[in-house]
Amino acid sequence: IGDATRNINGIFRLFPNHAKVVEHCEKIGFVSLPYILWKKPTTKPKYKGKGAFLGSGMLPPNAYVTLDCEFILIFRKGGPRRFTPKDPARYESRYTKQERDKWFTQIWDVIGTKQFLSEVERRAAAFPEEIPRRLMRMFSVVGDTVLDPFLGTGTTLKVAMELGRNMIGYEIDKEFKRIVERETHATK
């Protein structure tokens, strides 16, 4: 979830989308767990017509920090999940010590591959496959069901299929259907 900046009543300010989502999820019974910050390498500040650097350029005090991170919010419904000793799905889903040490840190610097997107695909909030792959391996086991309420181009669906997870996805924009079918067909 990316925060945003807005001009509200003539005053430039931060609109903390992540805080609003946390507040709402806690209100409906979810428990907040430590979040991850994904440092997006594609939103580096630039200047003089070469990008998105805004504010007063090189003059204080009206420049502002570029929002180049997104929050990966993690919630749980109820208490910790329990498994029987030696549960086969849990052992089949294990990760290595190196993966654990890399994944269970608060700041992720994940770089995606260059994408050549159609006009429809550019409207999606695209992210590298590595993001849902890590999250599914960290917080689910083989055979679990993953829910993506904003399916978009189907990245999460594709990764879930590759990892042996079941998947439910919702998307209100019908133009994405063809893209999702193409992505999932290539994965089968």
Walk through the language-model features, giving the residues of each.
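C-terminal segments of enzyme domains that contribute to small-molecule binding surfaces
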Residues: 188
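Core catalytic lobe of class I
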Residues: 1-178, 185
